[in-house]
Amino acid sequence: ASLVGYNYLKSSQNDSAFADAVGAGDGTKASGSIDIYNMSFGITYPTAFSGLPITKYNALDNGVKTLRSGKGAIYVKSAGNYFDWNSSPRYCGPNGAISDYMSCADAGNGRLASTPYVIVVGALNASGTKTSYSSPGSSLWVSGFGGEYGTTNPAIMTTDQSSCSQGYVRSGLASSNLFNNQGNHSENSSCNYDSKFNGTSSAAPTVSGVIALMLEANSSLTWRDVKHILATTSVQVDASRTKTLSGVLQYAWVTNAASHKFHNWYGFGKVNAAAAVDAAKSYTANSLGTW
Protein backbone atom coordinates (compact mmCIF):
# COMPACT_ATOMS: atom_id res chain seq x y z
CA ALA A 1 0.00 0.00 0.00
CA SER A 2 1.06 3.58 -0.60
CA LEU A 3 0.23 6.86 1.10
CA VAL A 4 -0.41 10.12 -0.72
CA GLY A 5 -0.72 13.47 1.03
CA TYR A 6 -2.84 16.36 -0.19
CA ASN A 7 -3.10 19.45 2.00
CA TYR A 8 -6.59 20.66 1.16
CA LEU A 9 -6.53 23.11 4.06
CA LYS A 10 -3.41 24.74 2.59
CA SER A 11 -5.17 25.23 -0.73
CA SER A 12 -7.73 27.85 -1.70
CA GLN A 13 -10.43 25.41 -0.47
CA ASN A 14 -12.59 26.30 -3.46
CA ASP A 15 -14.63 23.80 -5.44
CA SER A 16 -11.79 22.99 -7.82
CA ALA A 17 -9.38 22.31 -4.96
CA PHE A 18 -11.95 20.07 -3.28
CA ALA A 19 -12.51 18.12 -6.50
CA ASP A 20 -8.76 17.55 -6.79
CA ALA A 21 -8.59 16.49 -3.14
CA VAL A 22 -11.27 13.81 -3.57
CA GLY A 23 -9.91 12.47 -6.85
CA ALA A 24 -12.58 13.94 -9.09
CA GLY A 25 -10.58 16.80 -10.59
CA ASP A 26 -8.08 16.82 -13.42
CA GLY A 27 -5.80 14.38 -11.64
CA THR A 28 -2.80 16.69 -11.41
CA LYS A 29 -3.00 17.10 -7.63
CA ALA A 30 -4.73 13.96 -6.44
CA SER A 31 -4.60 10.82 -8.51
CA GLY A 32 -7.84 9.10 -9.37
CA SER A 33 -6.10 5.80 -8.60
CA ILE A 34 -6.42 6.39 -4.85
CA ASP A 35 -8.78 3.94 -3.11
CA ILE A 36 -9.42 5.60 0.26
CA TYR A 37 -9.61 9.32 0.97
CA ASN A 38 -9.22 10.22 4.62
CA MET A 39 -10.67 13.65 5.40
CA SER A 40 -9.46 14.73 8.83
CA PHE A 41 -10.66 18.31 8.70
CA GLY A 42 -13.81 20.13 9.71
CA ILE A 43 -15.65 23.40 10.11
CA THR A 44 -15.53 26.02 12.84
CA TYR A 45 -18.49 26.14 15.19
CA PRO A 46 -20.93 27.57 15.99
CA THR A 47 -22.48 27.32 12.54
CA ALA A 48 -25.94 26.82 11.08
CA PHE A 49 -26.81 23.66 9.20
CA SER A 50 -26.75 23.89 5.43
CA GLY A 51 -26.52 21.37 2.65
CA LEU A 52 -23.37 20.55 0.72
CA PRO A 53 -22.90 22.84 -2.32
CA ILE A 54 -23.86 21.03 -5.50
CA THR A 55 -20.37 21.26 -6.97
CA LYS A 56 -18.85 19.44 -4.00
CA TYR A 57 -21.70 16.93 -3.98
CA ASN A 58 -21.08 16.22 -7.65
CA ALA A 59 -17.38 15.67 -7.00
CA LEU A 60 -18.18 12.98 -4.41
CA ASP A 61 -20.91 11.54 -6.62
CA ASN A 62 -18.42 11.23 -9.46
CA GLY A 63 -15.91 9.61 -7.11
CA VAL A 64 -18.23 6.82 -5.99
CA LYS A 65 -19.43 6.17 -9.53
CA THR A 66 -16.19 6.24 -11.52
CA LEU A 67 -13.13 5.77 -9.30
CA ARG A 68 -11.68 2.35 -8.47
CA SER A 69 -12.85 1.20 -11.92
CA GLY A 70 -16.45 1.96 -11.08
CA LYS A 71 -16.42 0.36 -7.62
CA GLY A 72 -16.22 3.78 -6.02
CA ALA A 73 -13.74 5.68 -3.90
CA ILE A 74 -14.04 5.32 -0.13
CA TYR A 75 -14.43 8.65 1.66
CA VAL A 76 -13.78 8.67 5.41
CA LYS A 77 -14.56 11.83 7.39
CA SER A 78 -13.91 12.90 10.98
CA ALA A 79 -17.12 13.73 12.87
CA GLY A 80 -15.85 16.81 14.69
CA ASN A 81 -14.66 17.72 18.20
CA TYR A 82 -17.42 19.93 19.54
CA PHE A 83 -19.22 17.96 22.22
CA ASP A 84 -18.14 20.79 24.50
CA TRP A 85 -16.65 24.26 24.02
CA ASN A 86 -13.20 25.49 24.93
CA SER A 87 -14.87 28.49 26.56
CA SER A 88 -17.44 29.37 29.20
CA PRO A 89 -20.00 27.96 29.51
CA ARG A 90 -18.23 24.77 28.51
CA TYR A 91 -21.31 22.54 28.26
CA CYS A 92 -24.46 23.23 26.29
CA GLY A 93 -27.26 21.35 28.07
CA PRO A 94 -30.06 23.13 29.94
CA ASN A 95 -28.08 23.01 33.18
CA GLY A 96 -24.74 23.88 31.61
CA ALA A 97 -23.31 20.72 33.16
CA ILE A 98 -21.47 17.67 31.87
CA SER A 99 -24.23 15.53 33.42
CA ASP A 100 -26.65 16.87 30.79
CA TYR A 101 -24.72 14.88 28.18
CA MET A 102 -25.91 17.28 25.49
CA SER A 103 -23.50 18.13 22.71
CA CYS A 104 -22.70 21.68 21.68
CA ALA A 105 -22.72 20.65 18.02
CA ASP A 106 -24.01 17.90 15.75
CA ALA A 107 -21.73 16.04 13.36
CA GLY A 108 -24.34 16.64 10.68
CA ASN A 109 -23.56 20.36 10.74
CA GLY A 110 -20.42 19.47 8.83
CA ARG A 111 -21.83 19.57 5.34
CA LEU A 112 -19.82 16.63 4.02
CA ALA A 113 -21.52 14.48 6.66
CA SER A 114 -24.89 15.11 5.03
CA THR A 115 -24.12 12.89 2.04
CA PRO A 116 -24.40 9.08 1.85
CA TYR A 117 -21.01 8.90 0.15
CA VAL A 118 -19.02 9.64 3.31
CA ILE A 119 -18.21 7.36 6.26
CA VAL A 120 -18.39 9.67 9.28
CA VAL A 121 -16.26 8.51 12.22
CA GLY A 122 -16.63 9.32 15.92
CA ALA A 123 -13.81 8.97 18.46
CA LEU A 124 -13.35 6.45 21.29
CA ASN A 125 -11.09 6.74 24.32
CA ALA A 126 -8.77 4.03 25.64
CA SER A 127 -11.70 2.47 27.52
CA GLY A 128 -13.66 2.05 24.30
CA THR A 129 -16.34 4.67 25.00
CA LYS A 130 -16.94 8.12 23.52
CA THR A 131 -14.21 10.66 24.07
CA SER A 132 -14.98 13.87 25.91
CA TYR A 133 -14.98 15.89 22.68
CA SER A 134 -16.44 13.68 19.90
CA SER A 135 -19.42 15.28 18.14
CA PRO A 136 -22.48 12.99 17.99
CA GLY A 137 -25.29 12.80 15.47
CA SER A 138 -27.31 10.60 13.17
CA SER A 139 -24.69 11.04 10.43
CA LEU A 140 -22.11 8.96 12.33
CA TRP A 141 -21.44 5.61 10.70
CA VAL A 142 -18.91 4.00 13.04
CA SER A 143 -16.40 4.88 15.76
CA GLY A 144 -12.63 4.41 15.93
CA PHE A 145 -10.01 5.11 18.57
CA GLY A 146 -9.07 8.77 18.87
CA GLY A 147 -7.88 9.04 22.47
CA GLU A 148 -8.10 11.88 24.95
CA TYR A 149 -5.46 14.60 25.45
CA GLY A 150 -2.41 12.56 26.45
CA THR A 151 -1.93 14.16 29.86
CA THR A 152 -4.18 12.53 32.47
CA ASN A 153 -5.73 10.13 29.94
CA PRO A 154 -4.09 8.39 26.95
CA ALA A 155 -4.11 9.80 23.44
CA ILE A 156 -2.90 8.06 20.26
CA MET A 157 0.76 7.39 19.53
CA THR A 158 1.85 8.47 16.06
CA THR A 159 4.91 9.48 14.10
CA ASP A 160 6.09 13.09 14.18
CA GLN A 161 8.37 15.01 11.83
CA SER A 162 11.85 13.59 12.23
CA SER A 163 14.39 15.23 14.56
CA CYS A 164 14.00 17.59 17.50
CA SER A 165 14.14 20.70 15.30
CA GLN A 166 10.58 20.43 13.95
CA GLY A 167 7.20 18.88 14.57
CA TYR A 168 4.99 18.71 17.64
CA VAL A 169 7.79 17.23 19.75
CA ARG A 170 10.81 19.51 19.43
CA SER A 171 13.45 21.36 21.39
CA GLY A 172 12.17 24.49 23.08
CA LEU A 173 8.58 23.28 23.29
CA ALA A 174 7.94 22.00 26.81
CA SER A 175 5.21 19.40 27.34
CA SER A 176 3.45 18.09 30.43
CA ASN A 177 3.55 14.71 28.69
CA LEU A 178 7.00 13.38 29.56
CA PHE A 179 7.25 11.30 26.38
CA ASN A 180 6.72 14.44 24.33
CA ASN A 181 9.07 16.68 26.29
CA GLN A 182 11.82 17.95 23.95
CA GLY A 183 13.54 14.60 23.42
CA ASN A 184 14.22 14.11 27.12
CA HIS A 185 12.50 10.71 27.24
CA SER A 186 14.82 7.78 26.59
CA GLU A 187 12.33 6.16 24.21
CA ASN A 188 11.81 9.37 22.22
CA SER A 189 15.24 10.98 22.31
CA SER A 190 15.11 11.83 18.58
CA CYS A 191 11.63 13.39 18.88
CA ASN A 192 10.28 11.13 16.13
CA TYR A 193 7.02 10.24 17.88
CA ASP A 194 4.06 12.11 19.32
CA SER A 195 1.92 10.53 22.05
CA LYS A 196 -0.72 13.29 22.16
CA PHE A 197 -2.42 12.78 18.80
CA ASN A 198 -6.18 12.88 19.30
CA GLY A 199 -9.50 14.11 17.96
CA THR A 200 -11.87 12.55 15.49
CA SER A 201 -9.09 13.47 13.06
CA SER A 202 -7.17 10.71 14.80
CA ALA A 203 -10.08 8.26 14.82
CA ALA A 204 -10.85 8.62 11.11
CA PRO A 205 -7.48 7.29 9.85
CA THR A 206 -7.72 4.26 12.15
CA VAL A 207 -10.93 3.38 10.31
CA SER A 208 -9.31 4.16 6.95
CA GLY A 209 -6.62 1.66 7.89
CA VAL A 210 -9.21 -1.02 8.61
CA ILE A 211 -10.83 -0.33 5.23
CA ALA A 212 -7.43 -0.72 3.55
CA LEU A 213 -7.17 -4.19 5.10
CA MET A 214 -10.68 -4.98 3.87
CA LEU A 215 -9.80 -4.00 0.31
CA GLU A 216 -6.59 -6.00 0.55
CA ALA A 217 -8.72 -9.02 1.47
CA ASN A 218 -11.27 -8.37 -1.29
CA SER A 219 -10.42 -5.70 -3.85
CA SER A 220 -13.80 -6.15 -5.57
CA LEU A 221 -15.73 -4.49 -2.76
CA THR A 222 -17.72 -1.42 -3.76
CA TRP A 223 -17.97 1.68 -1.60
CA ARG A 224 -21.43 0.53 -0.49
CA ASP A 225 -20.11 -2.94 0.35
CA VAL A 226 -17.50 -1.36 2.62
CA LYS A 227 -20.13 0.67 4.46
CA HIS A 228 -22.37 -2.38 4.80
CA ILE A 229 -19.60 -4.56 6.21
CA LEU A 230 -18.61 -1.89 8.73
CA ALA A 231 -22.22 -1.49 9.82
CA THR A 232 -22.76 -5.21 10.30
CA THR A 233 -19.46 -6.09 11.99
CA SER A 234 -18.96 -3.14 14.33
CA VAL A 235 -19.43 -3.77 18.03
CA GLN A 236 -21.98 -2.20 20.36
CA VAL A 237 -20.26 -0.38 23.23
CA ASP A 238 -21.56 1.54 26.22
CA ALA A 239 -24.77 -0.46 25.89
CA SER A 240 -26.64 1.19 28.75
CA ARG A 241 -25.91 4.74 27.60
CA THR A 242 -29.14 6.76 27.58
CA LYS A 243 -30.24 10.24 28.55
CA THR A 244 -33.60 11.97 28.76
CA LEU A 245 -33.77 15.77 28.84
CA SER A 246 -37.02 17.72 29.12
CA GLY A 247 -38.96 14.52 28.57
CA VAL A 248 -37.18 13.72 25.31
CA LEU A 249 -34.94 10.67 24.95
CA GLN A 250 -31.70 12.18 23.68
CA TYR A 251 -29.26 9.31 23.58
CA ALA A 252 -29.91 5.58 23.55
CA TRP A 253 -29.15 2.58 21.38
CA VAL A 254 -31.97 1.91 18.95
CA THR A 255 -32.57 -0.94 16.51
CA ASN A 256 -33.31 0.30 13.01
CA ALA A 257 -35.54 -1.25 10.34
CA ALA A 258 -32.64 -3.39 9.11
CA SER A 259 -32.21 -4.82 12.64
CA HIS A 260 -28.90 -3.03 13.19
CA LYS A 261 -28.20 -1.28 16.48
CA PHE A 262 -27.36 2.42 16.23
CA HIS A 263 -26.45 5.19 18.65
CA ASN A 264 -25.92 8.89 17.92
CA TRP A 265 -22.70 8.78 19.93
CA TYR A 266 -21.25 5.73 18.18
CA GLY A 267 -22.98 5.12 14.87
CA PHE A 268 -23.16 1.37 14.34
CA GLY A 269 -20.48 0.89 16.99
CA LYS A 270 -16.76 0.35 17.48
CA VAL A 271 -15.03 -0.88 14.34
CA ASN A 272 -13.90 -4.49 14.67
CA ALA A 273 -10.96 -4.88 12.29
CA ALA A 274 -10.72 -8.67 12.47
CA ALA A 275 -14.45 -9.18 11.91
CA ALA A 276 -14.54 -6.66 9.07
CA VAL A 277 -11.64 -8.30 7.25
CA ASP A 278 -13.08 -11.79 7.75
CA ALA A 279 -16.42 -10.61 6.37
CA ALA A 280 -14.71 -8.95 3.42
CA LYS A 281 -12.98 -12.18 2.41
CA SER A 282 -16.24 -14.03 1.76
CA TYR A 283 -18.41 -11.07 0.79
CA THR A 284 -20.12 -11.15 -2.59
CA ALA A 285 -19.20 -7.79 -4.02
CA ASN A 286 -21.83 -5.46 -5.46
CA SER A 287 -24.66 -7.59 -4.08
CA LEU A 288 -26.70 -4.85 -2.40
CA GLY A 289 -28.81 -4.01 -5.44
CA THR A 290 -29.62 -0.55 -6.71
CA TRP A 291 -30.44 2.44 -4.56
What are these regions (language model features)?
Residues I54, N58, L140, A204-A212, ...:
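A structural signal for well-ordered alpha-helical segments within the folded catalytic domains
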Residues S2, D35, G72-Y75, I119, ...:
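Proline-centered loop/turn at the N-terminus of a beta-strand
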Residues K29-S40, Y117-V118, N184-F197, E216-W291:
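C-terminal subdomain of the subtilisin-like protease fold in secreted/lumenal serine endopeptidases
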Residues I74-S78, S143, K227-A231:
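Outer-envelope exported proteins of Gram-negative bacteria
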Residues G5-T115, S127-T129, E187-T206, A217-S220, ...:
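Substrate-binding/access-modulating region of protease and related hydrolase catalytic domains
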Residues S87-Y91, Y133-S134, R241-T244:
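Short aromatic-enriched loop/helix-cap "lid" or pocket-rim segments at secondary-structure transitions
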Residues Y101-A212, E216:
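Extracellular S/T/G-rich loop segment that most often corresponds to the catalytic His/Ser-adjacent loop
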